[in-house]
Amino acid sequence: MTKETHENHLRTHNGIFPVSLLSTQARQLLNFKLKSPSYYLLNSFKLLVKSEGNNQSTTADVTLTKSPNAYHASSAREEKDLQVSRRDTCFYCSRKIIKCICNEEHVGIESVQLKLILLLCQNLPNVTTNAKKYFSSLADGHNFTLTLYKFSLDNQTFSQLLSRFKSFATLTELLQVHNVMLQVNFSFQARQLNTEIQLRRCHSLEKTWKFLFGDYELPDVLKDMESSNSDWSDTSLKRIAYLCSLVEELKLHSSIMNDKYVCLVSKHNNALEDKFNSEAARQLLQKSLSIVASNLKQAENKTISYEEKLSIAQNSINEIQTQNRDLKLETEKLQDQIKALLERNQSLQEALETVKNDEKNLREMNANYETEMKEARQKLNNKEALISHYDDDFRAKELKISRLSESLREKAGLLEFQSSVSEQRDLLYQEQIQSSIKDMENVFRKNEYLMEELNELKNNLEVESSKVLRLDEEMKCLKDEQLSQFDTVFSLTDERDGLQKDLKNTKGNLDDEIGRSAFLKSQIRDQELTIEKLHDSLETLSQTNNSLQCEISEKNAELNSVNSKLSEGRAHLETANKENEILKQQLELSESKLASLLNSYQSFINKKEHLYSFLQLVEPSFAKSDSSNATESQISESVRKGISIFNLLFIVYKNVCSQAGINPSTKLEDLDEHTLSDELTYITKKFVQKDQEYQTKEIELRNYKITLQSLLEDKLIGVNTDCRSPSCSDFEQLGQESENNTSISGRVSKLVKSFNDSSSISNNTKISITKSPSGEKVSVFKEMSDIALRDMDKNRKLLGENVDVRNIVVQKDESLNIDLQNNAVVPELHFKEGMVYDSLENAYTYLAESKRMLANELQMKQEDLEKVILELEAYKEIFLEEKQIPCEEFMPGKNAKSEKSLRSVFQEQLMRETKRVRKLEKVNSELKLHCFELSERLREREHTLQQTFGDK
């Protein structure tokens, strides 16, 4: 066969032998593209044995050769016995194959591990020691890396080649080798696939192959295939069914091949006895066989250890797959959380913008409030002047009342003197009556004069009867002069008694008024005590405000710590991003390295001609019984070429080790199965570790993002507020608007707008109140002033605190401007001991309620002030109506008027005094009621304050 025809033969059939030599099973196996890499090694082995035999004039290879006739006859018989209908469709794609049975277009298995070589060594126990040594050195030199060349023979042709050797054992051993080939090919395919479904599929296929060709039975395999939930296609099931049938056929043919093997061995032994009678050849053969046996034992030990390592690696791969599934589920959950956090973040940004707008409105309201305060101060000064004027009037009226009491005492003394005079007159009248009885004549004479006096007395009595009913009734009864005289005497006595009673009543009323004034003073003192208690409670409130400031400072420190943690999280995120970029670069480098490996593979294929020339030299040794025409120089050159090819493979092994970060062994002799298997497992583990690191870095990056957003979400709320003491109108508007607006941002903005320093009390009234006006009745002003001052201090403190918090928020907004735009962080608000508010809204509602209560109380105090002013005006009217009565008329030393005139004057004075006393009693009763109402209000206020602070 020439070189050109041989190349064409290889190009068309991808094999060294014609297709007619192959059986149907061989053709079917060729459809899998599962070719044995050991053909070249066997040829080199046979050549080596032949070269040794030529040097010693007897070789083991001569015994394995046949005559041409026997060779052709055996091949023809095998073809007749084993030929079955051809399968001309591809097993993988189910398409018809036109050009070749094993077209590379349909099946893309590019490589197989070199474990097959060692297994072949195990299954050839009778090979010479030198050949096996060379064989194992080549296998060790290639490691368990991927072989980068196409194979040319299938299992059947390989069995035909081995049938020419005495060292051929059984076909079952070759089937074991073929099983290993299938396992290796499927494991390599699993590494090349990317998606999870394909990985599972290849894993299950690999498992079924183990069951098919291992120690398991066939029905278990089918059960496992049916029970498994892997995504297998119809083509894969067809393949497995076909392979099962193929295994059965191979078992049948193995018995036939064993029979043929017995015949061949007998023939070969006869040929050996005829042609090799020399002792040198036998010794050489024994040495080679002993060496091969020792090497086979070592190879068996190595394969056992390697299989154990493979089982450990498969367990680790299964664990990694379960971990990957869990990680994918966790990543999906984290992505959902990230979406929810982003939505909440947007709502917080909107709330912060509304708060900033409210802050601008508050500044404008503060400016208006300052102008209103100036006007209110002027009004308060004017009212203070009026109150001082009323105070002076009140003092003047008190002096007048004292003078009146003195004048009344003097009048009482005069009335007593007049009563004594009237008694003396009564005695004189009695003497006159007795004298008149004795002296009737004189009486009749004087009767006319007396009648005139009686008429005058009647007129006077008629005037007096309109004022005093008793005197009118008694005066009507007087008809006669005597009776009139007696009646006058009795009426004067009655008048004296009535005047005495009236004096006693006036004294009692004055004493009652003094007691009432003392009672009022005691009530005013009680009010002052309650006001002092209120001051104490307000002082406790100020202390709580100080504690609030301390807590706010602590919260600011916590904010700083949170910000430091956030900065650390950002640094971790940056490092994670950098590491991800590095991993991506490493993946790109690995891809580039794979491309370079493919290039080296293609370059190695280009050097395949050396192998072809090597095989051409080997082929005549099988075709001819006599020694081949090849010279020793040609054989040595072909061997050198084969060795150079394997050296090239060793170079590829070094490149792979360098890319995987392993220090390769520099000598072929130093390579063991253990070291090579360890290096292979290390490469796979390193690749898996890199993949896991990349996935963990992605998960860490997502976790950092989630933690950052959760921290921001938990602490983000807009704090841009100013506090003031609102007026009642503001609170009423706020209540109406809060009912209409239900959104949180709207309510917060309305509350913020209501907190100005503008209140219903003007600044002037506050300043006048602080001056503590004189008098015990004006103690209400002290209470109002203290409340107003405390309220202003509270508002100032809260304003300062809100400004500090707002500055902190602005700084944090500038620093946290990565993913969240203009968000602010707020601590929890602490008011009073044991009162914690989770949000500004609750705090503002509490402040609004307290300020409403204070505003209502201030309005009540203003109403009380107006009432007091009205009472002062009533006192003024009373004292203006008062007229001082001249006491000269009642002096005993001067000529007094007549009794009638005196009576009329006294009656008028008594009527005026009674009217004044009644007015004073009314004013007194009103003051008592007012004081009682004030005390009840103060008690209610204390009760409400105790309830609110106790509950909180």
Swiss-Prot record:
Keywords (A to Z) from UniProt: Coiled coil, Cytoplasm, Meiosis
Subcellular location(s) of the protein: Cytoplasm
GO cellular component, one term: cytoplasm
Species whose genome carries this gene: Schizosaccharomyces pombe (strain 972 / ATCC 24843)
SUPFAM superfamilies according to UniProt: Tropomyosin
Entry coiled-coil feature ranges: 283-611, 684-716, 839-942
Role summary: Has a role in meiosis.
GO biological process, one term: meiotic cell cycle
Highest rank taxon of the organism: Eukaryota
Protein name (record): Meiotic coiled-coil protein 3
Keyword Cytoplasm tagged: yes
